[in-house]
């Protein structure tokens, strides 16, 4: 699993697989789920990610347990200014 954040667009992306994306499904205005050709979740895109501190219900997302663990793990990582 890989976690990336684009500060310019305020987008968090959690990669569960390196398989190419076959289709994307917009869950709501903040979440997009990407699937590979087999229908397996490849990743989850969180738009306006910094607004998540106000509370975000991810319970309806596929693999929400994995997403929760990834975000918790990311909070433990040191951040260095360039």
Regions found by a protein language model. Give the residues of each.
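Small, basic N-terminal interaction modules of short regulatory proteins
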Residues: 1-82
């Amino acid at each position: 699993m890989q976690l990336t954040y684009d500060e310019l667009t305020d987008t968090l992306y959690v990669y569960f697989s390196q398989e190419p994306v076959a289709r994307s499904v917009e869950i709501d205005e903040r979440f997009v789920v990407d699937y590979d050709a087999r229908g397996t979740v490849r990743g989850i895109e969180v738009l306006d990610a910094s607004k998540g501190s106000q509370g975000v219900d991810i319970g309806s997302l596929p693999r929400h347990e994995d997403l929760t663990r990834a975000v918790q793990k990311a909070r433990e990582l040191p951040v260095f200014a360039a």
